[in-house]
A protein has these predicted regions:
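Structured alpha/beta or helical-core interaction and ligand-binding surfaces enriched in interleaved
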Residues: 1-125, 129-179
Length: 179
């Protein structure tokens, strides 16, 4: 993994990040439909539960193209944002990526992959990537969709912000698209 320290390359990567992530607090339609997205976990990989981490690491190692960019996505002071390039799809690179963005909201993306979108039930995380990547993460997408619908119905049984409710509905629309 290499930290991007060339200012022009960094600006190009951050411009792509900004197109992909319209906001760190909302799942906008622009973000969700952008074809450059590879993978994102809303609170960072460290918050995965049960066997999600292993599934994600295995899928990353098997499916990640040779050149991915990881960028922080925080509203921090100037200079807080940083980017790295993942050069190899190995478990060591995956662990380095986790360390680099420990506890941060971050995006991992490739500029040449058509994406699909999947929301995990546990902890409301978003996973996006090529369909083959998602099939490694959840071999039975129909089952995952049913689980998510149950989760959505339970969540909407009490009050949430409109944005959260819209994000849940957006997730269902994209899961319908996948199915």
């Amino acid at each position: 993994m290499k930290i991007i320290d060339d200012p022009q390359e960094f600006q190009r990567i951050m411009a792509a990040r900004n197109r992909i992530a319209a906001s760190q607090r909302a799942l906008s339609r622009k973000w969700i439909s952008d074809t450059r997205v590879f993978a994102m976990a809303a609170e960072g990989i460290v918050h995965f539960v049960d066997d999600e981490y292993k599934l994600f690491a295995d899928a990353f190692c098997a499916e990640a193209p040779g050149r991915l960019f990881g960028v922080s996505n925080e509203d921090g002071p100037p200079g807080w944002d940083h980017a790295v390039m993942v050069e190899q799809s190995t478990e060591d690179e995956f662990e380095q990526l986790e360390t680099e963005f420990y506890g941060q909201y971050f995006l991992l993306f490739s500029e040449d992959e058509r994406h699909a979108v999947l929301f995990t039930q546990a902890g409301y995380k978003l996973i996006a990537g090529p369909l083959s990547f998602l099939h490694r993460f959840f071999p039975d997408l129909s089952s995952q969709k049913r689980e998510f619908l149950e989760f959505k119905n339970e969540e909407l049984s009490y009050r949430h912000t409109v944005g959260y409710e819209q994000a849940l509905e957006t997730a269902v629309r994209f899961m319908n698209w996948l199915d």
